[in-house]
From Swiss-Prot:
GO terms for molecular function: nitrilase activity. Keywords: Hydrolase. Gene3D superfamilies: Carbon-nitrogen hydrolase. Changing C162N: Increase of activity. This is Nitrilase, arylacetone-specific. It holds the Pfam family CN_hydrolase. The active site is at E47 (proton acceptor), K129 (proton donor), C163 (nucleophile). Homohexamer. Residues 324-356 are annotated as: Disordered.
Amino acid sequence: MQTRKIVRAAAVQAASPNYDLATGVDKTIELARQARDEGCDLIVFGETWLPGYPFHVWLGAPAWSLKYSARYYANSLSLDSAEFQRIAQAARTLGIFIALGYSERSGGSLYLGQCLIDDKGQMLWSRRKLKPTHVERTVFGEGYARDLIVSDTELGRVGALCCWEHLSPLSKYALYSQHEAIHIAAWPSFSLYSEQAHALSAKVNMAASQIYSVEGQCFTIAASSVVTQETLDMLEVGEHNASLLKVGGGSSMIFAPDGRTLAPYLPHDAEGLIIADLNMEEIAFAKAINDPVGHYSKPEATRLVLDLGHREPMTRVHSKSVIQEEAPEPHVQSTAAPVAVSQTQDSDTLLVQEPS
């Protein structure tokens, strides 16, 4: 439960480690140390901070980009790895919460992952991006409804989304309905397709982060990364595709529940920390005017259904557990098991749980 009235937070704007996990872990710990030296309680990293965003899938044909696949897979983060334990131990040693963005390696697949590690080194939750964006689907698998999660911490109720999940109204509402107080908004660099697609720009996506705060009456900590010349060299960006990815693209910010920016922006090609003090009492003022999952909602007109049924790719069935069912009576139109439906407290979000 929340015990702090003021939370000092840091949003990272820095260059990712260019598909080098070991170097990335070192940099993660160093940035966490810098944030703690500034008195921060929480540090937030951008989308796929480890081992870096897979820009290669946007820069050429799928057959061309495959040459990066093995390296990217090998340097992605497993949550049961020594690398992850190093970061968790650093959180404990430094006494800081770490909201991490990473390419998660699980078995033979990758997922766009995020997790929250508390100041005791315990992972409070991990989640996966529900639907990777466009060509990201050639790299990453999908998440589940259970990944729309908000957890109670001493900092407040904390949840997270990745990148263009902030353009998904239903996913946002699922978090609003869990009374999120601090929102983690993980973004990559905004230097991709800067001349071709305004929707990918920092201007548009920082506006999405800002409106998230206003809609949800929460603090939004938006973290991003910076593309360097070393990144361009690694990805063989040359005359044929120079306009597709450029140096810079950083845009990190912390927004108040009324949409105010709480610190100055850094230059787009600069590395550093955006730091602000979050006065948690501001949430009550914002909620008094607009609470879309409370007094400003109309559940009899519109409501969200969150289906928490989880489907594994394999189900083990033992013969002794198989029960032969009697044939249904002629008048029975459906043999489907009933679905349990519950409504979250003080919310117009329905939770649907499949029968076990």
